[in-house]
Regions:
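N-terminal cap/lid segment of alpha/beta-hydrolase-fold proteins
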Residues: 1-28
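Short beta-strand element of the alpha/beta-hydrolase
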Residues: 33-41
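Catalytic nucleophile-loop/oxyanion-hole region of alpha/beta-hydrolase
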Residues: 43-46, 72-107
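Conserved alpha/beta-hydrolase
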Residues: 53-77
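Short alpha-helix in the alpha/beta-hydrolase fold that links the catalytic acid
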Residues: 225, 239-248
Length: 291
């Protein structure tokens, strides 16, 4: 796995519905060059991304990596979300809190929203709805279009579960093979043995996910901030072609794109991770305040 250069603090914030969220914060030694709020995938959590977060911190960025409600260090309501708007509101509050901190200690530097895998779907919708909160959008192998999308029958079953009000019924996440995430045996073992990884989600979460799928289709005209997308060439989860086509339709006039042809889905675990982290750092270094 490799150790992070900088160790994070583990902190908490409480959203308007009283839910207590854990997050990891990496604080640089000097005045931050920028602030980056990160959103993880459906199964992962902030603890997977210590290396890249530490590298960004060493490069001068304050990194806040939030564990989604019901995921990672958040043990309450595992795998559950009552509504898609609740997940959006969680991110909005985290961004607002981060902007307050930015305004206090480094008011002229940008705030960037980073979403990876499933978190890229959530980040895209937030960027479309609340563009005044971010100066840049980072999408790492985002779950905009995947090879694991629900079939017609899956959607029928989900609708029936909704009608039966089985909102808290747990459904296994169909990504139970670590080989889907990385080709590195040590990292596969880490994923397999990680007790904080999410293995199941509720019907209510899947309904929220379905709504996010709909919202991402209409999001591109509303995403106007500078953006960067990074894909893994050997990704078996993300439909790279469809995702790239979606990305090209963004209203943003400043779009950077990278694809790492030898990498599997989770770039964090791949041998060339210093390459993509360096590319991301260079892009962040060129970002300017827009909001």
């Amino acid at each position: 796995m490799g150790a992070a250069l900088s160790e994070p603090t583990i902190e908490q914030f409480v959203t308007s519905d009283g839910y207590r969220h854990h997050f990891r914060r990496w604080i640089p030694s000097g005045k931050p060059k920028g602030f980056v709020l990160c959103l993880h995938g459906i199964q992962s959590h902030s603890g997977w991304y210590g290396y890249s977060s530490g590298q960004l911190c060493e490069a001068g960025y304050e990194v806040v990596f939030v564990d989604r409600r019901g995921s990672g260090l958040n043990q309450s309501e595992r795998g559950h979300a009552r509504h898609h708007d609740r997940l959006i509101n969680d991110v909005v509050q985290a961004l607002q809190d981060l902007r307050i901190r930015r305004n206090e200690i480094a008011p002229t530097v940008p705030v960037t929203l980073l979403g990876l895998s499933w978190g890229g779907k959530l980040a895209s919708v937030v960027a479309a709805r609340r563009q005044e909160l971010i100066d840049g959008l980072v999408l790492l192998y985002p779950g905009i279009r995947s090879h694991f999308e629900a079939s017609i029958m899956d959607n029928v079953k989900l609708s029936l579960a909704r009608e039966a009000e089985l909102f808290e019924k747990l459904i296994p996440i169909p990504l139970d093979d670590p080989v889907l995430f990385t080709g590195i045996p040590e990292s596969q073992a880490f994923i397999r043995e990680d007790n904080l990884s999410l293995r199941d989600v509720t019907v209510s979460f899947l309904l929220a996910n379905r709504e996010f799928d709909n919202l991402t289709r209409s999001a591109p005209p509303e995403i106007r901030c500078p953006a960067i997308m990074m894909l893994a060439g050997k990704d078996r989860i993300i439909d790279n072609e469809a995702t790239s086509q979606w990305y090209r339709s963004l209203a943003s006039q400043e779009r950077a794109f990278f694809e790492y042809e030898n990498a599997c889905h989770t770039l964090e675990f791949e041998p060339d991770r210093d390459q993509w982290i360096g590319d991301l750092t260079e892009w962040l270094d060129g970002l300017r305040l827009t909001t």
